[in-house]
From Swiss-Prot:
Keywords: Ribonucleoprotein, Ribosomal protein, RNA-binding, rRNA-binding. GO terms for cellular component: cytosolic small ribosomal subunit. GO terms for molecular function: small ribosomal subunit rRNA binding; structural constituent of ribosome. Residues 104-116 have a biased composition (Basic and acidic residues). One of its GO terms (biological process) is translation. It comes from Erwinia tasmaniensis (strain DSM 17950 / CFBP 7177 / CIP 109463 / NCPPB 4357 / Et1/99). InterPro entries: Ribosomal_bS6 (IPR000529), Ribosomal_bS6_CS (IPR020815), Ribosomal_bS6_sf (IPR035980), Ribosomal_S6_plastid/chlpt (IPR020814), Transl_elong_EF1B/ribsomal_bS6 (IPR014717). This is Small ribosomal subunit protein bS6. Belongs to the bacterial ribosomal protein bS6 family.
Length: 131
């Protein structure tokens, strides 16, 4: 079986349906004896340019190992699902299991925010004890 990287974008009004879509597409892959190496829900993000007069979309990334029939079925599902505004399936040489740069950047921002919150609360505590 070959390895694929799949990214699809969902209409922002349909964001609440994304977990169900992920579950359905994952079942398609695992039902065809495929494996999912990485699944990332990037959430709602700004588009680089408008697509169908939309400026935001909900992004999902999948790295899978699956037979061609499963990939063909996924692409057909993407094509006939009106909520999916764009999709891209790329073949890759090997399974990618590490976190994507998008998730790494998000984690770094979260850590910086938490560090800043801890510093400000420490400063506030130190200011209270000096009085």
């Amino acid at each position: 079986m070959r390895h694929y990287e799949i990214v699809f974008m969902v209409h922002p009004d349909q964001s609440e349906q994304v977990p169900g879509m992920i579950e359905r597409y994952s079942a398609t892959i695992t039902g065809a004896e495929g494996t999912i190496h990485r699944l990332e829900d990037w959430g709602r993000r700004q588009l680089a340019y408008p697509i169908n007069k939309l400026h935001k979309a909900h992004y999902v990334l999948l790295n899978v190992e699956a037979p061609q029939e499963a990939i063909d079925e996924l692409e057909t599902n993407f094509r006939f699902n009106d909520a999916v505004i764009r999709s891209m399936v790329m073949r890759v040489k090997h399974a990618v299991t590490e976190a994507s740069p998008m998730v790494k950047a998000k984690d770094e921002r979260r850590e910086r925010r938490e560090d800043f919150a801890n510093e400000t609360s420490d400063d506030a505590d130190a200011g209270d004890s000096e009085e």
